[in-house]
Curated annotation (Swiss-Prot):
Binding-site positions, ATP: 336-343
Species of provenance: Staphylococcus epidermidis (strain ATCC 12228 / FDA PCI 1200)
Role this protein plays: Endonuclease that is involved in the suppression of homologous recombination and thus may have a key role in the control of bacterial genetic diversity. Acts as a ribosome collision sensor, splitting the ribosome into its 2 subunits. Detects stalled/collided 70S ribosomes which it binds and splits by an ATP-hydrolysis driven conformational change. Acts upstream of the ribosome quality control system (RQC), a ribosome-associated complex that mediates the extraction of incompletely synthesized nascent chains from stalled ribosomes and their subsequent degradation. Probably generates substrates for RQC.
CDD domains hit by this protein: ABC_MutS2
Molecular functions per Gene Ontology: ATP binding; ATP hydrolysis activity; ATP-dependent DNA damage sensor activity; endonuclease activity; mismatched DNA binding; ribosomal large subunit binding; rRNA binding
Cross-referenced SMART domains: MUTSac, MUTSd, SMR
Protein name: Endonuclease MutS2
Assembly notes: Homodimer. Binds to stalled ribosomes, contacting rRNA.
One Pfam family this sequence matches: MutS_V
NCBIfam families: mutS2
Gene name linked to the record: mutS2
Enzyme class: hydrolase
């Protein structure tokens, strides 16, 4: 896409806002490289990539990327034999630390979601290398500014010797400094350092009283810094130890640099991935500031931007407009008052296209749709080269000529005040001719104009639609609302009347323009009202359709999870059953062995075929395929509404609510209502009522089969549970559902422990996915 277009649309300002949201130079470099793509797959991938991170950013607290920095120059230097210092090694360490923290965050999120919700990020995380050993080595040997003493045994030994020798020197010099006879001879009673040697400040006139080496003097010459002979050898020893320390330090740094060199490829991958993560998070942060949404990209040409607004304008005052090229429309002509928002509309459309094709979420409501353009061309007034001594018309025309030379069917062209700056009749004719030409090219076009001739242009050409910006005659100011499909109308009479012009003059003027034009203006006014109403209805309809689709997708997903969960439970039960049968078979083999021994040794009258038959009866119990009860009954039970039945495929009891034809029935199992085949139902006998004493209860209310404890405090929940179970027993319920939610699991644990001890509870289990999953406990009452 031409840089000239990006400059006109102020895309660099958008990039600067995104750059402000980055943490590292790596992220800022990615922002600077950001440019609109034109390949469909690339654009869609970039948008999905940004949308994934935005979803995560809006739901979770992301780990900090602070300290992330570019390390590729350091890795290169390490690879060619250079030695990295401690600060540079710490930059390497921080990169590894940042990537490990982010990967840990992602793995925790993956564990919570129990599935891969973000495939693009998942792929990036899989590409992150394992650099634990390198991190450990650097972390154990380098602190923020230097090597740790324990970086090696040799270094620790050398530094220990330096410390002990320094202590002896200090003690020696302290004795000299604190000697009463030396107080007047010293400039200050301190020990200081000159040229890496411990010295004392001696007044120049007392030089002869101190045997030693002069290393420095004050600017005035009145103080000499002397190293007494008593510490010269110890200072020499420290110098030698410092040299040894430097050698050992260099050896350790060389060793660590070698580890960096060995992991050079992995470090470059980590740098690339984490730089991209920083870049994507910056996109997500910026998207939040503009309430950006993800558009859907279409192979066919389309533009639908519900309630779009210009992201560089003040969000509190900017007016959002729906911009749409409906059906086969290829050209939209906008008319309306000057400063009414026509140019802003052009720039909004162009900038949103550029943002979307750069992988940025766009400032519209959900549900936007876009096709992908190879180029966006602009001829917008405030960009013209007036300084080149060209007239306004010449400047426009020079730019238009360049556009017409390059545009094709994959282009979007934005014309501002097409044909302006010359004779109105010639300008209007040129404008229509130019529009005819670009229509033949197949480009999509949006143009603004103040020529009334162009209002009629759309009525005798296919694929052309009028639009206008609204003007409020009550306030005598533009509303900046865009009305798609409605041409601009003259407001001269209304404005004149508002300003107090005589009605006689206005009525006389109306007779001069004829009834046809008056009727057209009235028709346009009616269209304005209808357009605004239809626009809002379209947005609301899109929202409802989108919500319905989301609900459908969520239910489909939950149903699939339920099926998977049911399958896993069945397989688990199958495995347990098989293990029990195996155990029983093994035990039977042992019994058979003992029986044979009895027969052989004691002459027991036991026949072999009887033993084999008994063993086969046990073998027949072994279930090799599935535990699910696919029971094929030779004769189906006669089922009626109100019958109590056992659902064979699930092993659960229920009540028939109604029959659906001759083959299906609606069955209530607890809180779940399902349509099931009659062949899957087995009629059960209703339990006989035990004779009980009649207890009269006043104002008794019918209680539900479930108790919702969400929001209760722990003690309150258990008290409520006790009362509910008593009422459920009195109501002869066989099974009830306790809803405690998932949360931290504390309430679930408390409820289940309480049920274990409760006298009225036979047993309990966790809820199936279709019953509420882990957020529900199902209790069977005695």
């Amino acid at each position: 896409m031409r840089q000239k277009t990006l400059d006109v649309l102020e895309f660099e300002k958008i990039k600067s806002f995104v750059a402000d949201e980055t943490i590292s130079d790596l992220g800022r470099e990615k922002v600077q490289e950001m440019a609109p793509a034109s390949n469909f797959d690339t654009v869609e991938f970039q948008m999905n990539e940004t949308d994934e991170i935005s979803q995560i950013y809006n739901k979770h607290r992301l780990p900090s990327l602070s300290g992330l920095a570019k390390v590729s120059p350091l890795v290169h230097r390490a690879s060619i034999g250079g030695v990295l210092n401690v600060g540079e090694l710490n930059r390497i360490k921080r990169l590894v630390q940042v990537q490990n923290q982010f990967k840990t965050f992602y793995n925790q999120m993956l564990e919570e979601d129990e599935e891969v919700k973000y495939p693009i990020l998942h792929d990036k995380m899989n590409h992150l290398p394992i650099l634990t050993d390198l991190f450990k080595e650097i972390n154990e040997k380098c602190d923020a500014h230097d090597l740790f003493d324990h970086a090696s045994y040799t270094l620790q030994s050398i530094r220990s010797k330096i410390s002990r020798t320094n202590q002896r020197i200090r003690q020696n010099l302290d004795r000299i400094v604190k000697n009463q006879g030396n107080q007047k001879k010293l400039s200050d009673a301190i020990v200081t350092v000159r040229n890496d040697r411990n010295v004392i400040p001696v007044k120049a006139e007392y030089r002869q009283d101190f045997n030693g080496i002069v290393h420095d003097q004050s600017a005035s010459g009145q103080t000499l810094y002397i190293e007494p002979n008593s510490v010269v050898e110890m200072n020499n020893q420290i110098s030698r130890l410092r040299n040894d320390e430097a050698v050992e330090r260099e050896r350790i740094l060389t060793e660590l640099t070698g580890l960096v060199s060995a992991e050079s490829d992995a470090l470059l991958v980590a740098e690339s991935v984490m730089g991209q993560i920083d870049f994507l998070i910056a996109k997500a942060r910026y998207a939040r500031t503009i309430k950006g949404t993800k558009p859907t990209f279409k192979e066919e040409r389309t533009i639908y931007l519900p309630n779009a607004f210009h992201p560089l304008l003040d969000k509190d005052t900017v007016v959002a407009n729906t911009i749409e090229f409906i059906d086969d429309v290829e050209t939209v002509i906008i008319t309306g008052p000057n400063t009414g928002g026509k140019t802003v509309t052009l720039k909004t459309l162009g900038l949103i296209i550029v943002m979307a094709q750069s992988g940025l979420l766009i400032p519209t409501l959900d549900g936007s749709q876009l096709s992908i353009f190879e180029n966006v061309y602009c001829d917008i007034g405030d960009e013209q080269s007036i300084e080149q001594s060209l007239s306004t018309f010449s400047s426009h025309m020079k730019n238009i000529v360049e556009i017409l030379q390059d545009a094709d069917q994959n282009s979007l062209i934005l014309f501002d005040e097409l044909g302006a700056g010359t004779d109105p009749s010639e300008g209007a004719a040129l404008a229509m001719s130019i529009l005819d030409y670009v229509r033949r090219l197949g480009s999509l076009v949006m143009a603004t104009t103040h020529y009334p001739e162009l209002k009629a242009y759309s009525y005798n050409r296919e694929g052309v639609m009028n639009a206008s910006v609204e003007f409020d005659v009550d306030t005598l100011s533009p509303t900046y609302k865009l009305l798609m499909g409605v041409p601009g109308r003259s407001n001269a009479f209304d404005i004149s009347k508002k300003l107090g012009l005589s009605l006689n003059i206005i009525n006389k003027a109306k007779t001069m323009i004829g009834t046809d034009e008056q009727e057209i203006n009235a028709m346009i006014e009616s269209l304005e009202h209808n357009s605004k109403r239809v626009d809002q209805q379209r947005i609301e309809l899109d929202r409802l359709v989108r919500e319905a689709q989301e609900t459908h997708d969520a239910l489909s997903k939950q149903y699939q999870q339920y099926q998977n969960y049911e399958k896993s439970l069945m397989e688990e039960a199958k495995e347990k059953a098989n293990q029990r049968v195996k155990s029983a078979t093994k035990e039977a083999d042992e019994i058979l062995k003992e029986l044979r021994n009895l027969r052989d040794h004691k002459g027991a009258e036991v026949k072999e075929h009887e033993l084999i038959d008994k063993k086969k009866q046990l073998d027949d119990q072994y279930e090799a395929k599935s535990i699910k009860q696919h029971v094929q009954k030779k004769k189906y039970d006669t089922i009626h509404a109100g019958d109590e039945v056992k659902v064979l495929s699930y092993g659960q009891k229920g009540e028939v609510l109604e029959l659906v034809g001759n083959e299906e029935a609606v069955v209530q199992m607890g809180i779940i209502k399902m349509k099931l085949p009659i062949e899957d139902l087995e009629k059960t006998k209703k339990k006989k009522e035990k004779p009980t004493k009649m207890v009269t209860r006043q104002n008794r209310q019918t209680i539900k089969t479930e108790l919702d404890l969400r929001g209760y405090r722990y003690e309150e929940a258990l008290n409520e549970l006790d009362q509910y179970l008593d009422q459920a027993v009195l109501s002869n319920y066989e099974q009830v559902y306790i809803i405690h939610g998932k949360g931290t699991g504390a309430l679930q644990k408390g409820v289940q422990q309480h049920l274990k001890k409760h006298k009225s509870v036979r047993q309990f289990r966790g809820g199936m996915p279709n019953e509420g999953g882990f957020g529900v406990t199902v209790a069977e009452l005695k």
